[in-house]
């Protein structure tokens, strides 16, 4: 068949077809050609374009036809209407509308809008976005409902110490997301063994402040090591949001440390430091996966500043990286890979300024925050197998290396173990059995550590 397009036709002006006045093709390919041309038109923003063959005639041993194309008007996104959640955060709403305002509308744009709403941990989409075409406007309708991303995990215990005084031990991990309908994120963490260590962390993140792509977050971290020292760290950061799950921060961080015992000749001493910091964060959620909702996390923070102590004043630099990713082999088999790294550069080091690690959120098989280093790097792996919709089992293979210049100690670490997760009506129960070893300490059953947690969502 010979299809006459014409000279300077609309299809040629739009770059959808080559600049030829006639196309020649087998008759059997005509339908595929018409569909492909309409798809090209749709990608260019002509969603309601019409295409047909007219004036069909037979000429000797071939057919002739004219190609008729009606492109209506270029379609652009004029508005995004959110249904199902009247108190959807205004800052998020304004930002996503700004991002797509007057963007050429096609199915790829609709897919991106759907994907951007999937990044919001505080909503679920009840169905795929729909489009309303009028004579002059193009509106996208998004259907959402408020989700339950809040999380609670903890226990508390009471007892007496050797002097008969009351001691409190326990654990609390509380995450509140969008409780005030502004997309905020508040995290509170407290852990005390009633004797040696107490940790308290609190953080608050406010995204899209003043309905702009800017956000702010603040942190307070307090760590007390028995009757030896206490560190109090504060941080404030101003961030720019490229999108909801990708942002950069510029901030200020300071720490004040108190030597409680004041022992002569100790590597522990009072100090204070301050840093100008830069931070990059990327998080990709998989909201339909209750077991593993965080698919990818990239968190890299670096800072340059100064530390003052009773004996010296040093310029310092640090970098801290936390990388995580779930690799889905299929629905039942998942490989989880984490990498935690930290480096502190200084002319000399004080014990109470070192990075502390070990435990369920770090290299497993070691007591919580029982290790310290100015340099630490690790690869933490799990092979996860989903046995049923409500239960999964996993292996634990953790590798680590650290350097502690206050004790001239370099060690390689190995953590081995297994665990399982059980989904109940009230939350997710996790049990982990792990054993840690170093070059000077072989794996022994007596050194094994059991980690138990129960995360309730509300």
Spans of features found by a protein language model:
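Short glycine-rich, acidic/polar surface loops and turns
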Residues: 380-382, 413-421
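Hydrophobic core residues within well-ordered beta-strands of beta-rich domains
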Residues: 170, 200, 276, 317-319, ...
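Periplasmic polypeptide-binding modules associated with outer-membrane biogenesis and secretion
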Residues: 1-160, 171-173, 187-196, 201-203, ...
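Solvent-exposed, non-transmembrane alpha-helical starts
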Residues: 12, 76-78, 163-165, 229, ...
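A short, conserved beta-to-alpha structural element at the edge of catalytic cores
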Residues: 16, 418-437
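Gram-negative/organellar outer-membrane beta-barrel architecture
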Residues: 106-299, 327-329, 355-360, 369-373, ...
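C-terminal outer-membrane beta-barrel translocator/porin domains of Gram-negative envelope proteins
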Residues: 159-164, 277-387, 395-399, 403
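Extended hydrophobic-aromatic, low-complexity segments
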Residues: 152-154, 349-350, 389-395, 404-408, ...
């Amino acid at each position: 068949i010979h299809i006459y397009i014409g000279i300077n036709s609309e299809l040629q002006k739009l770059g959808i077809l080559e600049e030829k006045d006639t196309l020649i093709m087998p008759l059997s390919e005509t339908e595929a050609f018409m569909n492909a041309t309409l798809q090209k038109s749709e990608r260019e923003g002509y969603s309601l374009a019409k295409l047909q063959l007219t004036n069909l005639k037979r000429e000797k041993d071939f057919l002739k036809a004219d190609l008729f194309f009606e492109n209506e008007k270029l379609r652009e996104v004029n508005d995004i209407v959110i249904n199902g959640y009247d108190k959807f955060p205004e800052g998020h709403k304004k930002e996503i509308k700004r991002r797509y305002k007057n963007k050429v509308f096609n199915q790829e744009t609709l897919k991106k809008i759907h994907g951007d709403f999937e990044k919001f941990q505080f909503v679920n989409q009840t169905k795929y976005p729909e489009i309303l075409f009028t004579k002059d406007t193009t509106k996208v309708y998004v259907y959402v409902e408020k989700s339950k991303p809040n999380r609670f995990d903890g226990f508390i215990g009471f007892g007496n110490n050797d002097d008969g005084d009351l001691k409190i031990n326990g654990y609390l991990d509380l995450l509140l997301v969008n409780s005030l309908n502004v997309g905020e994120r508040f995290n509170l963490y407290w852990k005390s063994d009633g004797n040696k260590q107490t940790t308290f962390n609190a953080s608050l993140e406010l995204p899209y402040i003043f309905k702009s792509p800017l956000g702010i977050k603040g942190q307070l971290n307090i760590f007390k090591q028995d009757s030896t020292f206490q560190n109090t760290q504060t941080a404030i950061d101003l961030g720019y949001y490229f999108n909801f799950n990708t942002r950069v921060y510029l901030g200020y961080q300071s720490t004040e440390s108190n030597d409680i015992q004041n022992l002569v000749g100790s590597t522990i001493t009072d100090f204070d430091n301050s840093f100008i910091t830069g931070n990059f964060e990327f998080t990709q959620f998989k909201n339909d996966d209750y077991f593993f909702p965080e698919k990818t996390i990239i968190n890299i923070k670096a800072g340059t500043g100064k530390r003052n102590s009773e004996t010296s004043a040093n310029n310092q630099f640090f970098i801290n990286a936390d990388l995580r990713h779930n690799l889905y082999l299929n629905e039942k088999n998942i490989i989880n890979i984490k990498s935690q790294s930290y480096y502190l550069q200084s002319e000399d080091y004080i014990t109470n300024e070192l990075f502390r690690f070990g435990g369920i959120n770090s290299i497993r098989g070691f007591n919580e925050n029982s290790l310290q280093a100015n340099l630490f790097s690790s690869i933490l792996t799990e092979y996860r197998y989903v046995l049923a919709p409500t239960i999964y089992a996993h292996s634990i293979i953790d590798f680590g290396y650290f350097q502690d210049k206050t004790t001239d100690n370099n060690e390689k670490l190995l953590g081995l173990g297994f665990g399982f997760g059980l989904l109940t009506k009230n939350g997710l129960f996790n049990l982990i059995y792990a054993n840690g070893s170093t070059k000077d300490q072989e794996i022994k059953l007596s050194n094994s550590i059991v980690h138990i947690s129960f995360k309730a969502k509300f």
